[in-house]
Amino acid sequence: MGKEKTHINLVVIGHVDSGKSTTTGHLIYKLGGIDKRTIEKFEKESSEMGKGSFKYAWVLDKLKAERERGITIDIALWQFETPKYHYTVIDAPGHRDFIKNMITGTSQADVALLVVPADRFEGAFSKEGQTREHALLAFTLGVRQMIVGINKMDTCEYKQSRFDEIFNEVDGYLKKVGYNTEKIPFVAISGFVGDNMVERSDKMPWYKGKTLVEALDTMEPPKRPTDKPLRLPLQDVYKIGGVGTVPVGRVETGIIRPGMNVTFAPAGVTTEVKSVEMHHEQMPEAVPGDNVGFNVKNVSIKDIKRGFVASDAKNDPAKGCEDFTAQVIVLNHPGEIKNGYSPVVDCHTAHISCKFQTITAKMDKRSGKVLEENPKLIKSGDAALVVMQPLKPLCVEAFTDYPPLGRFAVRDMKQTVAVGVIKSVTKKEATSKKK
């Protein structure tokens, strides 16, 4: 796979039965970094298990199992190339914490592929189905580019009437959420049979649109914020024998280089970067979008952990916060949310309880106009301005300064009850600890 193509991160969203896994598996299978030997091995195993029909989803299941078992993910397995771009699938659907991952992970997505099934569309698109929630989330979290794959066209005899019906429904909803649907390709596909995935299908002469691969090639490459100061939320911290402490994470903004002094917030620990590695290769620098491990001097694995943020000690270093003000949209909370409510907030890689200190205003979701000052309570469907206080040290940023560190999910009762975008942050003046 060539190094010269622009990289784009793709998140695949949609209901459980939409055929996301098969569709994603098909792309990776046809265009991806899985070598023929591995594919033959998977095919042999899947036919031995009588799963021959599921070979694309099977590819994905095997990858998922490997991803869940092992620490090191062979990222190449999750990549595929279109004529124009190099795509990485950054979250495989069907994961228990998918919505949480979408928020902490969608910060990483440049494009969302929304897969809707032609066979059981009504169920997937009902109030209870996840399709609407995923689309709203993608928009709230700043993913502005989308492709809609109307999948399983083989189950409705490739009928135009069915495509049109689903198109109208999804198009209407996406407009309501805030998407400019003129720019969204709607593609008629079968991830299982392969229609309009890579090659144009001859079964839908009425369909004048693009294949999925052509649609992927019409997306705009992301503008990577290299000119902003460094922000790198830690996904994990490893202790590697003979090397030392190695934090791992994705560069969100700025650049990280060996020799640089980095500060980890909220702890205020500062140290020197010895080396930066990606896919087991040393790099002279890493830029936004790169998933890297970097080796740091004299820092114990006890000093830093997942959810901390690495930043340049000499250029707007990150700090912990006293509190932050956010616009919060309540998605599905069974009751009423009042001042004092203290759910878990997932922001970038951090997972910390935060208190709704003051709900200062209820607002209109679309226009942002204030509807009511200091409301007594908010409930599902409401948008509000809330001052939030972390109950443990936390580093977040305003969405306008550092977008990936300025959006979050509110989790309670094992589900995402709200999402938020941070307007402003009261920072703690850190007492720095030099290492």
From Swiss-Prot:
Residues 5-226 form the tr-type G domain. Residues 70-74 are annotated as: G2. GO terms for cellular component: cytoplasm. Residues 91-94 are annotated as: G3. InterPro entries: EFTu-like_2, G_TR_CS, GTP-eEF1A_C, P-loop_NTPase, T_Tr_GTP-bd_dom, TRAFAC_GTPase_members, Transl_B-barrel_sf, Transl_elong_EF1A/Init_IF2_C. Keywords: Cytoplasm, Elongation factor, GTP-binding, Nucleotide-binding, Protein biosynthesis. GTP binds at residues 14-21, 91-95, 151-154. GO terms for molecular function: GTP binding; GTPase activity; translation elongation factor activity. It is found in: Cytoplasm. The keyword GTP-binding applies. Residues 151-154 are annotated as: G4. The keyword GTP-binding applies. NCBIfam families: EF-1_alpha, PRK12317.1. This protein promotes the GTP-dependent binding of aminoacyl-tRNA to the A-site of ribosomes during protein biosynthesis. Belongs to the TRAFAC class translation factor GTPase superfamily. Classic translation factor GTPase family. EF-Tu/EF-1A subfamily. This is Elongation factor 1-alpha. It comes from Cryptosporidium parvum. The lineage of its organism: Eukaryota, Sar, Alveolata, Apicomplexa, Conoidasida.
